[in-house]
Each structure stands twice: as C-alpha cells, then as structure tokens.
C-alpha cells in the first residue's frame, strides 16, 4: 500500500517510550502499542502517537496540523470506562477522520454480552442460554437453566473478573459470584449456561467482503482434571501460570466440515453485530460437536505473537501485511453510507 500518515490513539499510560534500551518489551504492558506503531514505522508510514485518558480535546488540533490519512484507534475505554469506547469513535466520525477498527454501533452491540446474544439468537446463531442480574439485584434463574453456570461481567472484556470460581455449581456459589462481579467490577452480571468443551477463536477481517482466519484453539495440556478449562484472567495474562499449566494457543485440529461450519458462524455473527474492520469471535465446541458463539471482540489484541496475528500468519498474512490490511479497511470504510 502507499505510505500514509497515521495518528495513533492510545491510552495515555500505554504510550511506548521513545527509547526501549534495557526494557523487556515482551513483558511490557504497552507491548501491543509498541509492536503496531514500530512495525508501521518500519514499513515507511509516518506515525504520530497521541495518549488519551479523559479528554478528547487534543485530537482535533493534532489532526489539524498533522493531517493524518487515518487514525489508528487502539483505545478500549475512555476515562477508564469501557462502555465509553464507542464515543471516541463517534467523535472521530464527527471530525470526518478515517479510523481503523469497528464503528460505534458495532462496538455498542458487541460490548453488551446480553444484547449481542439476543441479536445472534434472532439470526439463529447458537448461543448459550443466559440471564442478566442487574447491579445490586439477586440472581433468579429461568427454569431452563441448569448448573453448572458461568458468571461474567456484562460489559468487560479481556477475561476481567473471570477465575475458576466463575463456574458455579449451586445457588450459593451463584449468589456469591454475582455479588463479586457487582462489587469488584461495578457492572451487571451475565449468567450463562456453561458449555463444557473446547475454547475456540476465529479472527475476521473486512467491511463488506469478509476474510475468515484459521480457527484457533486454547489448549490446557497440564491443567489438573479438577480445574475448569476456561480462559480466566490468569490464563490470559500470567505467563508463569500459562507455563505451569501447559496453556497455549494454536490452530485447531478439526475436520473440514467442522471448520467450514465454524467459519460460517463467525461470518454470520460478524454481520449480525454490524462489525467492520477486524474482530475476533469467541466460541465453545461441546463434546457433541455443537458450536456456540460466546461473544465478539471488536478490538482484539494486535500484538505480534498473539492469537490474531498468529492466525493471520497461518492464513498467509505476515504481521506487516496484517497491519496494512487493517489500515486499508479503515481507509475504505464510509460511515455515512452505513445503515
């Protein structure tokens, strides 16, 4: 692609340092931002970084003098509030700035795990049975829901608040875990039928025409038999815990028909939730071979070596080409023509 000016919007505490001498970048919390920004620079693109926390005022003047062709949106929250991420993108649209990633409507639909499941179910895409427990309320289960269940935040991503205790097997455990979500994360809780099986991820790229990346699987080779095989916060973010339990991700070993079915589900979910740019669809595959969509993540981790980039590599997109594909999709997206 042609060389472009890129304004990278990142959380202010995740702005990579200019000099990384003596720093273990692999363990840095800003690794994704560093990987993306430096790779684009190495490709010849001019990248300016702007850290944002609770004020969007800096975007307009910076865009005014820098004149970016596109904004690289790496924001996942605003002022620490995850449900405000769509407002950042809405502001970019009002400024008539091209941007990478998902549109505001898709962010809203995907962020709410209950609303997204209702939409998916309407489109006859299999999802686990669920109920929502609003903040401060006690759980009341529909008759069709049976233990074990899994309790999550209605809005948070990145496995926030998920641990082995999230899978509950009786009413007492359920009440305790719902209270934990309410008090520790300050959000409503979603209680889902627990799907015992394989943890799968599918990356999707595109606006109208979609490309589906290879099905990826999280495996738990050394996990004790009495532990639930789920993507907890420790599983996702603790390298020590990953090594101790043989947790890794790689291309899923499935037959061609299963892969084709899961790919179709991922594409249908992507379209049903009005996503664009790129996203990851999370699924579970039960012991009978039935796949269920758990949720969609419209801003997956783009760090080098992470699931999305690794599956793109297997698909035939190098890390450099993946990032340029994401830029190209953002440049081609026309928000005023949607709906």
Report the location of each language-model feature:
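Short acidic, glycine/proline-rich loop/turn micro-motifs
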Residues: 17-22, 160-163, 306-309
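ATP-dependent carboxylate activation and anion-phosphoryl transfer catalytic cores
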Residues: 119-121, 253-339
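Phosphate-binding site of ATP-dependent enzymes
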Residues: 171-264, 287-292
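A short beta-strand motif that forms the metal-chelation/ATP-contact edge
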Residues: 6-7, 72, 201-206, 289-304
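ATP-binding N-terminal substructure of ATP-dependent carboxylate-amine bond-forming enzymes
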Residues: 1-100, 104-105, 109-111, 122, ...
